[in-house]
A protein has these predicted regions:
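Hydrophobic core segments of transmembrane alpha-helices in multi-pass, intramembrane catalytic enzymes
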Residues: 70, 123-124
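N-terminal, membrane-interfacial amphipathic/helix-forming hydrophobic leader that caps
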Residues: 1-2
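N-terminal TM1-TM2 helical hairpin plus the immediately adjacent luminal interfacial "cap"
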Residues: 5-118
Length: 124
């Protein structure tokens, strides 16, 4: 699969990797406070009306393994879905699924947990 065939998948992959590198430079992707400061989902923040976190959390990953597993999954499934739906519809499905996954994550986390990752966006 080439960039020409599935450009959005590649863009999301690059974006996730660049965001992870930035998080590591600013603190640590394993540090809950760093993740919270950069847009991860927390019970308190969502309850205070910070709904933008449902979107921002899609691009944050907790540790290198989380990033690697989601990147491999995105490459395989995202490429397949983007070729099937087309780039524009793929963006809509990816973002909508990610926001839905973030909302589901929020509904199940404890008040002291931090939620992040693209799993909801990838797996719908």
């Amino acid at each position: 699969m080439t960039y020409k065939e599935t450009p959005v998948t590649y863009i999301f992959l690059i974006l996730n990797i660049l965001v992870w590198i930035a998080i590591e430079a600013l603190g640590s992707s394993s540090n809950p406070e760093t993740l919270r400061n950069l847009g991860a989902i927390t019970y308190v923040d969502i309850r205070s009306g910070q709904y933008w976190r449902y979107l921002s959390a899609i691009f944050l990953h907790i540790g290198i393994m989380h990033l690697l597993v989601n990147s491999i999954s995105l490459f395989i499934l995202g490429s397949l879905l983007e070729r099937t739906l087309g780039s524009y519809k793929f963006i809509i499905v990816y973002i909508a699924s990610g926001i839905g996954g973030s909302a589901l994550s929020y509904s199940m986390i404890s008040p002291w947990s931090v939620g992040a990752g693209a799993s909801g966006a990838i797996f719908g």
